Amino acid sequence: MSNPSCILPADPRWPHRLLERLGKRTPPKLWALGNLDLLALPKTALFCSARCPGSTILATYDQAAHWRDAGRCIISGFHSPVEKECLRILLRGTSPVIICPARSLPKRIRPEWKQPLDTGRLLILSGFDDSEHRVTTELAIRRNRLVAALADEHYFAHIAPGSHTERLAQEVSGWQA
């Protein structure tokens, strides 16, 4: 497993789409652990409000299995219960995954992440420095914006009315206009 990297805008691996979509809200640095080459792949962002109907949950798990079997690179915070289960589904395959925590990079790597990191199919990417240890609503909003800006496609499994996810979906639709 590699050591964490700090990526600056001058780095050739820097995703230039960030500045196009986020403008002044672009993080000045990105911190990464894992295979940075995953940033160059076509990516689908996964978002799901914390509470959603059962039918949506099952359909989203089926979609995650489809992405896994198709080898699609999925990027997400994997924070909501549905997103967490999708991560478990994705990690059971060989497809690439980018996890973006709403805080600094983790100090300890979860056991289920070690093998995907070692084989180069996992990237843990954060827009937050070491001073941001705890997830907050504000950090989650900024993280979700980062995830959306990095993605080529966006999959909103469920958007609760009035939620932060709804506001993000509206922002993303403005990028595609």
Enumerate the predicted regions with their spans.
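Acidic/glycine-enriched connector segments
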Residues: 61-69, 81-176
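Structural motif
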Residues: 10, 33, 48-51, 79, ...
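Short active-site oxyanion
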Residues: 4, 70-74
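Short, positively charged patches
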Residues: 1-57
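A structural signal for isolated positions on well-ordered beta-strands in alpha/beta enzyme cores
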Residues: 45, 75, 96-100
